[in-house]
């Protein structure tokens, strides 16, 4: 009994690995995450061109965007049981996730439940291209060089944690949340980034709607997020 978890990358279907495409094409059942009932799955939209929908069943699993850990754990158990029940029928099963399964992924919650309750299932994890690697390629930039350090901030609401990370790293990757853009820019100034430090901001990396802008830090002070209210990724380099 085998389950393949596939990292679908940032958005461009052509960035899926050869192994990922092979598993998707052979799948009898595909599971894909979404935040609420009726909302399209991003991971599914990336992989759809490789799915034979006439022979493959597709199940959307709900991962609500809430902070109540108890409620979340209940949903994780439900989702993992749905997957396990199907795997135990002997079908070729695939779980899709955006980016890479090891990085801020819904897969990690499923994986923990399966290891604890269904350790008879053989799990295969196929890596995907993280959004910030696709971002760096599109921007034709280096994230870090030599002995430089790199920090990743998954969301920007904990400003103290951001301050600690920024103070100790040469390059910072900010993911997902642009509501605190002004505060983040000020923290960069406070923690050693110069007026000429390079800031690159992107939305919708690797798809047709992609927006990518590079500016000096001094040009972003007292301005709104140049890529809009929400940014997918912002990279700040201290020394360029």
Model regions and ranges:
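A polyampholytic, Gly/Pro-enriched intrinsically disordered region
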Residues: 76-85, 142-154, 218-232
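Short gly/pro/ser/thr-enriched loop/turn and capping motifs at secondary-structure boundaries
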Residues: 37-40, 130-133, 181-182, 207-209
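Solvent-exposed alpha-helices and their adjacent loops that cap or buttress functional pockets
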Residues: 22-23, 87, 95, 142-146, ...
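A contiguous loop/helix-start segment that scaffolds small-molecule binding in enzyme catalytic cores
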Residues: 3, 166-240
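Short, surface-exposed amphipathic charged segments that create phosphate/polyanion-binding patches used
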Residues: 71-80, 139-141, 165-168, 212-220
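Class I S-adenosyl-L-methionine
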Residues: 1-13, 18-20, 25-122, 212, ...
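General beta-strand structural signal in soluble alpha/beta enzymes
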Residues: 32, 60, 95-97, 125-128, ...
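Class I SAM-dependent methyltransferase SAM-binding "motif I" and its flanking Rossmann-like core
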Residues: 102-168
């Amino acid at each position: 009994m085998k389950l393949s978890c596939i990292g679908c990358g940032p958005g461009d279907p052509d960035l899926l690995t050869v192994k990922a495409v092979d598993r998707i094409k052979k799948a009898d059942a595909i599971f894909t995450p979404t935040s609420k009932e009726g909302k399209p799955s991003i991971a599914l939209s990336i992989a759809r061109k490789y799915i034979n929908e006439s022979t493959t069943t597709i199940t959307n699993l709900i991962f609500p965007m809430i902070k109540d850990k108890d409620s979340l754990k209940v949903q994780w158990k439900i989702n993992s049981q749905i997957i396990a029940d199907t795997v135990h029928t002997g079908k070729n099963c695939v779980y899709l996730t955006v980016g890479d399964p090891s990085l801020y992924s819904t897969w990690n919650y499923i994986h923990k439940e399966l290891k604890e309750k269904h350790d008879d299932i053989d799990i295969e994890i196929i890596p995907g291209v993280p959004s910030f690697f696709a971002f760096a390629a599109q921007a034709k930039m280096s994230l870090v060089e030599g002995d430089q350090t790199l920090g990743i901030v998954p969301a920007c609401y904990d400003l103290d944690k951001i301050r600690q990370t920024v103070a100790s790293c040469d390059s910072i990757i900010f993911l997902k949340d642009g509501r605190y853009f002004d505060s983040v820019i000020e923290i960069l100034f406070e923690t050693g980034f110069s007026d000429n430090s390079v800031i690159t901001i992107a939305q919708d990396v690797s798809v047709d709607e992609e927006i990518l802008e590079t500016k000096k830090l001094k040009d972003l002070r007292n301005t709104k997020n140049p890529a809009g209210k929400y940014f997918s990724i912002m990279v700040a380099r201290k020394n360029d």
